[in-house]
Amino acid sequence: MKKLLDNITAEVTKAFVEAGYEEKFGKVTLSNRPDLCEFQCNGAMAAAKQYKKAPFMIADDVAARLQGQEMFASVESVKPGFLNLKLSEEYLAEYLREMQADERYGCEKTAEPKTIIVDYGGANVAKPLHVGHLRSAVIGESVKRMSRYIGHNVIGDVHLGDWGLQMGLIITELHERKPELVYFDEAYEGEYPEEAPFTISELEEIYPTASGKSKEDAAYKEAAMQATFELQKGRRGYIALWKHILSVSIADLKKNYDSLNVSFDLWKGESDADPYIAPMAEQMKKDGFAYMSEGALVVDVSEERDAKEIPPCMILKSDGASLYNTTDLATIVWRMKDYHPDELIYVVDKRQELYFTQVFRCARKTGLVKPETGLKFLGFGTMNGKDGKPFKTREGGVMRLQYLLESVNEEMLKKITENQKAKENLEISEEEAKETAKMIALAAIKYGDLSNQASKDYIFDIDRFTSFEGNTGPYILYTIVRIKSILNKYHSMGKDESGAVIEAAHSASEKNLMLALSGFGAMMENAYEETAPHKICSYIYELANAFNSFYHETKIMSEENEQIQKSYIRLLELTKSVLETCIDLLGFKAPERM
């Protein structure tokens, strides 16, 4: 099914060609003056230069050929040379009937599906998720869902920080606390226990303690570095301990990500890249890309067109140790080997842009990826508190993500309870109220984040995000629940709309709702192409507003003409379907009632 804009452009282009002008001038866009028209074409302005003719004369020529077409209710040529277009109500209704019959609501699947890996999440094992992890998880999940909806094969990878000094620190601290553990006995040859010798809460306390000690005590740090070295060389007891650290951490991380409705196809980490580092570095040297500089192995990645200096990409330190660059490049190696992706998207803090420029250029220069492989850096801004500074706890520390979710849940539960009392509607059980609060809280957090362009910083304002009015997640959910309520009421009266179709609009507000719905396919294509979930948010806010205007101006349930009422119900069903599809792409759902 073609996008509505494409259909209109095709008709206007045909008129340009019939009038003797090139087809490139027939492009139609949404009107930037909705008070005057719905769509516009400015092609006559550009054609005037080429044909040395007054633009209004060209616009008049084209308008004359469009007059009387079934597609348009009105076609106006406006000086100095604009074409103002309004669709006919019948044509628009026909387009919506097609949309409703199409399970994808007019958003065509790509004809050329790609394999895309989205790298997001970036959690570290043995550490709790904090608010700094929110944006990567929320944006990455939405990018994954959008890309899948367009028809691509998408693989989400959490890319865990599970290798390096933090592991040595934990092993060293465990050895100090529990030296009797069999993992530290090098002579031991038996099977290691299946159960971990620590819980997640112990693990989360061990790491910061060990980290603090290593900063004060040089011998302790040396022991941690030695433990890291032995782990990476494959010492049996340390590998067994490391596996316990991983399984305990991942189980907890999955619980946390589940509460955000975020999931990953791969739970790979830096450790998975480790076996590829030595052969990769060797190949880079052999091919003449990598060379020694001040004892370190580096690859030049600067280009003539650079406005500022791009330093070389370091592959190995002077002591032969690897860095984040090394791990990220080796990760590209195994991803290309195992999954042959056409594109890799990294959802990370925008402050890492220079770093990823180095990594991507190095990967291209050394042939780790094919020339046509896409490498995309989707950098996000900071989530700030009301003071405009990075979000902190009242004590000034970094807030755990779990605590943030709980505080928004509590705020939503309070609002739901107050609403129930105000309405004297005590039908909702405590259990349902809690579940509903959880769903709305998640929408508040995710929509609050995703409605901002990813690269922009934003202020996390709990009062604004949890409001049922304005451009918020709860407002969108309230709109969906309102539609569900009307549909339930209609069906509870024993009425049935089967066989009915969406008719031509009976009012301006109904037409506005229909126009908003018709833009779904074009919006989705644009949001995917620009990797921009905020475009979905803008669209559903506009759609929710259009529906609520229609709802307030139309007596849906008391409409006496049964055919018109059925048409309204069909229109509501389509609105609900499109809104629900969109919020699913953003990563949240609507409750049955609020």
Predicted region positions:
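Non-catalytic interaction-recognition regions
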Residues: 1-93, 110-594
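Secondary-structure boundary elements
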Residues: 91-106
